Regions:
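Core segments of cupin and vicinal oxygen chelate
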Residues: 2-3, 10-52, 88
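N-terminal beta-strand motif that seeds the catalytic metal site of vicinal oxygen chelate
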Residues: 1-19, 69-72, 121-126
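Mid-chain, well-packed structural core segment of small domains
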Residues: 71-83
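Short, small/polar residue-rich loop motifs at catalytic or cofactor-binding pockets
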Residues: 100-102
């Protein structure tokens, strides 16, 4: 089987505020923003270089409360550079956490959903 994750729903309270954060602060691409009906708005945002997107919106039918996602983990090339870029854009992010299995930067979106950004270790170094 060949499976690829396409979309992760991220529960938010204010769609416009969340969209601005993800696009302006984190550099996500705004792929789609459509008000389908009065009750339904679907916004798809994709991290640069990712084949998987997130969806935020209104009336999407999810049962998760805004801010309840405890960890969404993505891979980044350089934890130090990403941390510096985030802080330069005013994003509150924790400093680099060094672990044997990678280097991590943690942040929260305006609703409190937690993102962990992981720089993978250089396994070729032996």
């Amino acid at each position: 089987m060949d499976w690829k994750i396409e979309l992760i729903f991220v529960p938010v309270t204010d769609v416009d505020r969340a969209k601005e954060f993800y696009v302006e602060k984190l550099g996500f691409n705004a792929d789609f923003d459509q008000r389908v009906t009065e009750e339904l708005r679907f916004v798809q945002l994709t991290p640069p270089g990712s084949a998987c997107s997130i969806a935020i919106g209104e009336g999407l039918g999810g049962t998760l409360a805004p801010g309840s996602l405890d960890v969404i983990q993505v891979v980044i090339p350089d934890a130090d550079a990403v941390l510096a870029e985030l802080r330069a854009k005013g994003v509150e992010a924790e400093g680099v956490d060094e672990q044997p299995w990678g280097r991590f930067v943690t942040l929260r979106d305006p609703d409190g959903n937690r993102w962990t950004l992981q720089q993978l270790p250089d396994y070729s170094a032996g």
